[in-house]
């Protein structure tokens, strides 16, 4: 997702947030069934401009297996929910729709 305007998604397996940050930006929005973490990180980085730190390159901090919660949802459901998140957080609608269409086309031609 870096090509979508320099925004990296992250997984909660290696992400720690102080309580004061949750008080400032809010908790995870549970209305997003498969991308509430994406919304949280979007608000954290793009809306509130919080900065963080990262680990060394190629440092293992958690281990995920295939078939987790998010794999129950289709590619289209993920992209649609991320589109709603971007719109709900005030990103330019033309940019959001363009990204949505490009991601769908990219996935279609990949099949």
Predicted regions and their residues:
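Membrane-proximal basic amphipathic "stem/tether" segments
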Residues: 80, 87-111
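Conserved nucleotide-sugar donor-binding catalytic segment
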Residues: 1-78, 85
């Amino acid at each position: 997702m870096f090509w979508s305007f320099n925004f990296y998604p992250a997984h909660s397996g290696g992400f720690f947030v102080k309580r004061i940050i949750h008080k400032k930006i809010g908790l995870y929005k549970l209305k997003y069934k498969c991308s509430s973490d994406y919304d949280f990180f979007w608000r954290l980085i793009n809306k509130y401009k919080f900065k963080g730190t990262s680990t060394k390159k190629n440092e293992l901090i958690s281990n995920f297996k295939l078939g987790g919660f998010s794999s129950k949802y289709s590619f289209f459901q993920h992209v649609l929910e991320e589109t709603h998140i971007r719109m709900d957080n005030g990103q330019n609608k033309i940019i959001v729709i363009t990204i949505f269409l490009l991601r769908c086309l990219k996935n279609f031609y990949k099949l």
